[in-house]
């Protein structure tokens, strides 16, 4: 009788230890709709070149590791929307998200012209506003039921280089929770690592929640490219097959727009659309992602002119 009771107690303790650090139950989070993978009919399907600046962490928890996790997760999920090409060299123009926030966003407006020349359409940057893990446990017993709560808030902003203005700003949370059974006085290091894992998952959930918004945004904004070189009758464009340019596409050639300021406050309102100089017809591709075009209609085209799908 005593032996049977001892065996039952031993089995109970082993089962409790096995449940010491179970994997967190993944909460359901919204994923972008399948319709976002291809732009709706009526919008051009040319991919926009994006400069994704590394996010930074303002909270006292998670440090740089959490910021890297948020940046990588957002990039991975947004790449599935198929509306964007990530331009790492272009991102170097602006630095990191921390630099943009430190300057109040003025750095974006200052470098917009340089970004246009490099072919960037959008700049995406962000920060972790808050991140923490809290726990609630039973007061009594050797094996205690513990519920862990991970809370995070991520802010992401999108800057339209062509319009020279911010076109999206939002904050989303990634709150998750998990229940587990833990032995009283369990190893502290294991508990801390468990909390870190839950916090990483929380910020991933927050990053994923931005994908539907940003995917829709990319489908609605105009793509803008640039005349990179002119050799004889051939005009070379800084976007091609990878970006979604097709042979036979007609591109309109535009002059650079003018900055528009509020006469009362002096604040910049945006950039006007440039004047149409003519149209080009795409006849071939070159390099990794470039297109060759010829003059279709209109007057003189010069290197540095901007182009849009007609």
Give the label of every model feature segment.
Residues 61-72, 105, 109, 146-149, ...:
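Soluble non-cytosolic domains of exported or imported proteins
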Residues 47-54, 58-129, 165-169, 246, ...:
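N-terminal segment of the mature soluble domain
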Residues 250-287, 296:
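C-terminal soluble interaction/assembly domains
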Residues 18-46, 160-232, 247, 252, ...:
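C-terminal/domain-edge helix-coil "capping" segments
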Residues 1-4:
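Positively charged n-region of N-terminal signal peptides that target proteins for export
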Residues 125-182:
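Amphipathic beta-strand/beta-sheet edge segments enriched in Tyr/Trp
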Residues 122, 219-222, 271-278:
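Short coil-to-beta-strand transition motifs
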Residues 6-15:
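Bacterial N-terminal signal peptides
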